[in-house]
Amino acid sequence: MDYNKTLNLPKTDFPMKANLPVREPEILKKWEEMDIYRRVLEKNKGKEKYILHDGPPYANGDIHIGTAMNKVLKDIVVKYKTMRGYDSPYVPGWDTHGLPIEQQVIKILGVKRHEMNPVEFRKVCKDFAFSQIERQRQQFKRLGVRGDWEKPYLTLDPEYEAKQIEVFGEMAKRGYIYKGLKPVYWCPSCETALAEAEIEYFDETSDSIYVKFRVRDDLGKFKGIVEDLSNVYFVIWTTTTWTIPANLAIALNPEFDYSLTKFGDEVYIIAKDMIEEVRKETGLGDYEILATFKGKELEGMKAVHPIYNRDSIVVLGEHVTLDAGTGCVHTAPGHGEEDFLVGQEYGLEALNPIDEKGYFTDKAPGYEGLYYAEANKVIKEDLRKANALLAEKKITHSYPHCWRCKSPILFRATEQWFASVEGFREEALKAIKEVNWYPAWGEERITNMVRDRKDWCISRQRVWGVPIPIFYCENCGKPLINDETINAVKELFRQKGSDAWFEMSAEEILPEGIKCECGSTKFRKETDIMDVWFDSGSSHAAVLETHPDLKWPAELYLEGSDQHRGWFQSSLLTAVATRGKAPYKNVLTHGFVVDGEGRKMSKSLGNVVDPAEVIQEYGADVLRLWVVSADYTADMRTSPEILKQIAEVYRKIRNTARFLLGNLYDFDPDKDMLPYEELLEIDKWALYRLNRLVKQLTESFDKYEFYDFFHPVHNFCVVDMSSLYLDILKDRLYTYPAKSKERKAAQTTLYIILDTLVKLMAPVLAFTSEEIWWHMKHDRNNNFESVQLADWPQVKEEYDNPYIIEKWEKLFDIRKDISKALEIARSEKKIGHSLDAQVDIYPSSELYEFFKGFEDLQYVFIVSKVVLHDPQEVAPENAYVSEDYDLKITVTRAPGEKCERCWMYSETVGTIKEHPTICARCASHIEEQLKV
């Protein structure tokens, strides 16, 4: 007789080899055919809403590993919330305007911006943006991200632009929008102003120069200290040589001590506490302090500009520190925020001798036409000729750069439009406190940024963007903006999009009969566009308030930690300014993706991990599993080695699911399920461990701690299941009669475990959970077309059975000692497989009573025979001694012959005439099977 045919061996067509790169696209196609996004929304329609508002990625180029991580995290949130019964639509968006697209159009398409009119150039930009959106949309879908991909929100949509104009108009109406001449971050390469969020800091090598400004008027303060002023100088220090031509003042701190310090024949005015530092940096020799004054005593003195022989007045400023330099700060009001503010106090001109391309104008005689960076050498030579260059050297320091072109930027005073953050700063700080920040340090970070930030420069000198909806009177030059003009522009954009601004005249746009206060009816349009952060920062109004599936405020904004100064902040500012509160209730941030050694990814280092390549090699589910493999609130490491490890963990999880499926091939959950009371104790223990997993994942996911998925699920599958419960269960599943109560108890437990596990996996392992679901049989109340339509598992109180937990946890702990004893016997060649063994247990009285509470310990220990000795019996001298329990163990070869069917050794093998090669237990099972 072929006894193999009498065993209930696993059967499943669920493949062992995942082959995800091939299988996942097939699953995606099925999701599209069933319109899974709408199906999920219909299921939860009318229930409590949970809105995660998508921060729009920039429509430019392929997605990178950080973008992939961000989208997967969002998808996990939304899928979890829908399984918890929330109506949780996900409307993805794209940021479509701005400089990067202009640059790509010029670079890739070879477009010459200045040879095209704005309308033509904008059309090329729009077409490029749409091509990038389609490219990224397919990449996001390939990650398994579920969303309204056919109707995303785009910042270039006419409806969106109209709503953005409304936000701008409301801020203007409340007095928060103004035009002013101010030093702003300026990129000469891109020829535009930049917001703080568009600045990155990189190390830069610059000049470090000490410059002498001879005193022209000391207000009589130095009389009697020096004979005359011909050799008395204020000494300044700067790392921006090119700003010297724009110097109009020298700033001192009113409370610092400043010394007239004699070095040789010259007297230098330096902060007393910086004299030694200056001496060291300049190589000056011995000195003598002639006198010391408070900074405020020197206010109003005049020095001579070393190049132009004009006055450079001495002013006071609290911004002057002793961190570096001389305590005398070179002040060019047209080139620095603090310089500008001090200059305003003293009525100084915001002199800006540099044009939008970075070249000196005729306001800097002698340097006209020189690029600012190239002028450094000439300026230093002129200072040297004037005997004003005290010392120079090169230093490396952190310097602001344009985030797009990576060029160094400069501060440049120009006329710009600003949002006055000062007008609603306190409201914004209050709103921050009302939001839940994950991790908690995010609150302090954005609080500091908002508290310390300057007014927001919102104008850009480009054409691909939303125009600033302001008109100027051609007669008096006064700007025109009111409810009437804003409504006219808003409605125009709603109908025709913002291209209309560039296609129509002011007269065609403005309502008929509108006049300036001066009486003129002739107007021209503003030519600047809005900062792209104003675009995306208006999404709460343009999307949350207008989309029929969404609501304001959102439950969650989830982006990288750099967005505290970006989208989180621009959204907060526009919302507080117009609605008085934050547009979000919760904000979660993740770190950046770095390589396996914690280094930033870069092409030059060759350490870039491309998500497309990961998907091609391993599949999207392995990438998704990586996303939850570590605490993503810090920087996340990835590398080929790390991904290989993740793929191995995935394989183990998949194998566990395959084992469960394989042993449920003949199980019908509607007919074969047993009630909890009829399960064996070990089955109840397995359900306790499952229940613990449900509880842990639910609590963690509720707190957005999705990294708590990886290790618990891995441990449950590998340790609790594969290495323990499922290993023990094999005998009952394979050798017992197919319809026996014992086997049905095991299958009931396996079904509950699989049904629960596949649902727990669904938000993370989107494709694999679906593949498992489609291979499962389901009970009539659970027979959904997709696992995404199923409910999240509930914690079952009855599974937390204290008696079962305590008893079986202790036995499995003791089982570790049994395994150690078996391993020693194996190493001593006493046994091969554990089923070759007989285990003799010599326990204490207490443990003896404990062991008597179990039947068939041989199946738990996976040996052929267990002999429990009386506590009075003495164990052999060579017995294994447990370190944790009062227990000794011996291992010998089991008596009897090996059963051909169950592979256990038994003295009953050969005693059954009809079945001479199998044990009595197996013979009994076969006879029982034949009766069915």
Swiss-Prot record:
Keywords: Aminoacyl-tRNA synthetase, ATP-binding, Cytoplasm, Ligase, Metal-binding, Nucleotide-binding, Protein biosynthesis, Zinc. Gene3D superfamilies: 1.10.730.20, HUPs, Ile-tRNA synthetase CP2 domain-like. InterPro entries: aa-tRNA-synth_I_CS, aa-tRNA-synth_Ia, Anticodon_Ile_BEm, Ile-tRNA-ligase, Ile-tRNA-ligase_type1, Ile-tRNA_ligase, M/V/L/I-tRNA-synth_anticd-bd, Rossmann-like_a/b/a_fold. GO terms for biological process: isoleucyl-tRNA aminoacylation. Its EC number is 6.1.1.5. GO terms for molecular function: aminoacyl-tRNA deacylase activity; ATP binding; isoleucine-tRNA ligase activity; tRNA binding; zinc ion binding. It is an enzyme of class 6 (ligase). Binds 1 zinc ion per subunit. SUPFAM superfamilies: Anticodon-binding domain of a subclass of class I aminoacyl-tRNA synthetases (SSF47323), Nucleotidylyl transferase (SSF52374), ValRS/IleRS/LeuRS editing domain (SSF50677). A motif ('HIGH' region) lies at residues 57-67. It catalyses: tRNA(Ile) + L-isoleucine + ATP = L-isoleucyl-tRNA(Ile) + AMP + diphosphate. GO terms for cellular component: cytosol. Coiled coil: none annotated. L-isoleucyl-5'-AMP binds at E559. Zn(2+) binds at C899, C902, C919, C922. Its cofactor is Zn(2+). Pfam families: Anticodon_1, tRNA-synt_1, zf-FPG_IleRS. ATP binds at K603. Belongs to the class-I aminoacyl-tRNA synthetase family. IleS type 1 subfamily. IleRS has two distinct active sites: one for aminoacylation and one for editing. The misactivated valine is translocated from the active site to the editing site, which sterically excludes the correctly activated isoleucine. The single editing site contains two valyl binding pockets, one specific for each substrate (Val-AMP or Val-tRNA(Ile)). Monomer. Catalyzes the attachment of isoleucine to tRNA(Ile). As IleRS can inadvertently accommodate and process structurally similar amino acids such as valine, to avoid such errors it has two additional distinct tRNA(Ile)-dependent editing activities. One activity is designated as 'pretransfer' editing and involves the hydrolysis of activated Val-AMP. The other activity is designated 'posttransfer' editing and involves deacylation of mischarged Val-tRNA(Ile). This is Isoleucine--tRNA ligase. It comes from Caldanaerobacter subterraneus subsp. tengcongensis (strain DSM 15242 / JCM 11007 / NBRC 100824 / MB4). The gene is ileS.
